[in-house]
Amino acid sequence: MWRIGIDEAGYGPNFGPLVMSAVACQAPSELVEADFWEVLHPAVGRCARRGGHLFVDDSKKVYQPGKGLAGLERTVHAFLSCLSHPGCHTLADLLQCLQTQTSVGPMIDEPWYHGGTTVPAAAAAADIASGSQNLKDALAQAAVCWGPIYSIAIDTPRFNGIVDRHGSKGAALAVAVVQLLRACLAHAPADDGLVIIDKHGGRNFYAPILQELCPDAWVVPIQEGMTSVYEVRWPQRVIRVILRPEADATSFEVALASIVSKYIRELCMEEFNAFWKTHVPHVKATAGYPGDATRFLADIRPTLERMKLPMDRIWRKR
């Protein structure tokens, strides 16, 4: 059976991409609702756990500004090593490896993006290799097959286009969820599964969004509210979908998806800040969140106007 987790990074900022990721694995039916922190405990652990484990936790606990990307990076690249795609040596490689077949090329309209940032950027190769081997051993012991992993990076121009078409920034999350789920479920069309999605915003009703997965599917609401639960039924399979707040605290796959999303967004923001630093040498780097983003915009505005860049190329409307 499939276990799939979905989470995002960058929904609230004014600058930089919204990144949403899905991580999936096939597990024996008796493990479909098991605690994977326990199942894979020889190789992985939460941030409070000591030792050489890969950290799988809320990305805000794994990564803290000023402490570098090594914690995120070691986990992401160890899990990527379980997939059968070529190695990733740059940010552009990483985005190419993780994009869905239907997603638009990443950041094609961002003036700051070049994709040449080398990855891994901070974690030592030996640390990644040891974590990867421990993970593969734990997965084999549990008879769990890891993958696929997908990410969608919605750059500012596309984010603003979605807002213009739908009148809501929440539509960007819906677009990404549908693309990611379609890509994951295409891997084994006859298998049942469990999908857990970290819920954001005030939406409680998701049946219309899930119906977009396939016109032939039958979406059955089981519960709608703070936590919303659905069954998506096809003639040959049933997928249970759970949307709940702070799911990265209780779902291993959601926590891992949050780490993948955060890692990609932080790499993107490094390129963002480096671009503006070359044009405005005195400007202090930003994470792109409200408040500080306003300060950053004021610092770069004269250069922005001189470059004749439209505001909606770099600044989100919502």
Predicted regions: what is each one?
Residues 1-318:
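RNase H-like, Mg2+-dependent phosphodiesterase core
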